């Protein structure tokens, strides 16, 4: 079967010319040349946003116009009068398919125009690339994909009567100098038509991209015409990887990587990447328990307004294997020493790990020793709290991640006389009343600590089921534990004056305190116009608060509006 021969190009493709005789008997020749052919375009669609989303034909079509004058009997001697010819020229562009389609039997449905944009261009007289008139179409878009041609129709508006057609009536010419403004009576004459070569309109998925602007577009843009100039290649590379010589800024990649990387401040090879703190202590990495900011964190005493000593830290030997969770005890105030972190120390609770923060007033914190791990709540916020449940035992035996015999031997090597005496308060037994004042004598505290240490060796196995067997503990463990507990306190020394007590009741209790015991009535919200001194407002204080007011603040003094001073008993004690 014979294949169909390709369609022959039209005779007016790319170039076309036409001649006419003027009223004065001169011959004018019009010549159109499509200097820049359209090559590709992306379909802009027919949706609601197609008019705003322009996809111009690339490169923009450029048509050159030249006008020649000659004698009707001598076509060889022509004179270029493009710049001297006094007339207005317009070029109108239309779109047609490259392969004509047969008409169907039924009438086609009415469709919107396929060509959008600005299809009309006026002549621009430019000196480069040569002296001629140019028509530029920088804003032509096609709605649907396919293969098309552009038809350019030239229209002329003559301004002088001598340039009219030979058979044109005289009255049809307009007066060049009207006496008063009036509607124009001039009209346009169609001169000739030229078509472009076929070009392809791609869909958005298949569009290869825009190429660099041509030299002709640059020359035209330099002379003041509106042409979009692209100095970089925007062609898609399908199936190829990006190379270093194609739009790749190596320095920009380095800058972005430096901006998101976290430097290793300690130089550990096995240091994990630091992550945000969480409120759970079970997710702390045992190989790096202290964190990066442990050496910069101040003690709880510094948070309350007075300076605390630097915690003493020393490198510990690596653990032989996994062991139950250990409870960290505060370090004693000692001369500043360079902090060192040991990645081999196995612990789930430490100073650098997460800490439970409780709102509390600025009051002196109470120390917490190793023998009172289940002591009642203290407003000091910088202690690590154990997660092991405790029902009613006041003293618990802490678990360690290495054999206690080695720990007792190492702790016995601490200097015993290098630390200043501390005025600490001994823990209260369960049968001691909560309102009894604390003793500030360090000798009494030392004796109580010596007597309380043996109790920690014999707790009930039902209360602490997760502790290691007690038979592994050495005989000198209680003495060393009491000695180390007194030397591992983090709170600074705080001396209470005679006759003064803590405002908050820090005695032992087996249940949580109520809201009224923890906070005064000044902290309660006021509703429905309630005032602190009204009868409908609760004024109940804790026992410790009442004792404090009875001893130091039985009467309150205030100034009246008339300037007179008045005193009365505090309403909280009535």
Swiss-Prot record:
Keywords: Cytoplasm, Nucleus, Sporulation, Transcription, Transcription regulation. PROSITE patterns: VELVET. Its main location: nucleus. Residues 314-323, 330-341 have a biased composition (Pro residues). Residues 343-353, 385-394, 406-415, 448-458 have a biased composition (Polar residues). Residues 1-22, 39-60, 255-500, 513-540 are annotated as: Disordered. Residues 513-525 have a biased composition (Basic and acidic residues). This is Developmental and secondary metabolism regulator veA. The C-terminal PEST domain is a region rich in proline, glutamic acid, serine and threonine residues that is required for the light-dependent regulation of development and secondary metabolism. It comes from the Eukaryota. It is found in: Nucleus; Cytoplasm. Component of the heterotrimeric velvet complex composed of laeA, veA and velB; VeA acting as a bridging protein between laeA and velB. Induction: Expression is positively regulated by laeA. GO terms for biological process: sporulation resulting in formation of a cellular spore. InterPro entries: Velvet, Velvet_dom, Velvet_dom_sf. GO terms for cellular component: cytoplasm; nucleus. A motif (Nuclear localization signal) lies at residues 39-44. Residues 459-474, 482-493 have a biased composition (Low complexity). Component of the velvet transcription factor complex that controls sexual/asexual developmental ratio in response to light, promoting sexual development in the darkness while stimulating asexual sporulation under illumination. The velvet complex hat acts as a global regulator for secondary metabolite gene expression. Controls the expression of the cyclopiazonic acid, aflatrem, and aflatoxin gene clusters. Controls the expression of the sclerotium-specific pigment asparasone A gene cluster. Controls the expression of the aflavarin gene cluster.
